[in-house]
Amino acid sequence: DDTPQKVLDSLKKLNIILILNKKPKDFGWSNINLQIHSTAQAIQCAKKLSLKYLAKTRTDCRVYSPNFLIYCKTLLELFPINNNKNARIISTDHSGKHMPYKLGDIFQFGRLEEMELFWKESYWENDIKKIYSGKKIINDTPVVSEIYLTTKYLINLKYVLKWDLECWW
């Protein structure tokens, strides 16, 4: 709604699929609802195109290697999960080692089904009430940003969260 027409016109000339979304009314903690909504809409577009894999970046991420996506796909093939239910999501790490459930959201790569489950559309303030019993901090861990996304994903996988580093490692 608020993108200048001149910008839209220049983007349409690039031979890309341009997805325009209406912004959610509530942006959520640190605009997390904007990221969830736009990513969920992009995943739906990818499903319609019958894509098998998805790379998701934030606007503050740049990938310069022309072989990087092939590298990511090869990593998934070299390190499979031992069950038929799930696959891995490749992610960047930016200080998440000592913060439980902080899988980076700057770059992610995975099978479309897995990425769809991770980015399942729901909104932070609703989930804080429903899933986390109104708690915004659990065992000294803030339920925000990447931690919110990762724990929501793990809960969808029926994983029992312990909210400690041992469980995360």
PLM segments and residue spans:
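Short beta-strand-to-loop acidic/aromatic patch adjacent to the donor-nucleotide binding site
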Residues: 51-62
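Short, aromatic/basic amphipathic alpha-helical patches
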Residues: 4-15, 68-75, 153
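Conserved glycosyltransferase catalytic-site signature
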Residues: 32-40, 61, 142-147
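Histidine-centered beta-alpha loop that forms part of the nucleotide-sugar donor binding/catalytic region
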Residues: 23, 58-59, 92-95
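Short, Asp-centered acidic motifs that coordinate Mg2+ and/or phosphate
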Residues: 17, 53, 88-89
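Active-site-proximal specificity loops/subdomain of glycosyltransferases
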Residues: 1-49
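Catalytic core and acceptor-binding pocket of nucleotide-sugar-dependent glycosyltransferases
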Residues: 63-69, 76-169
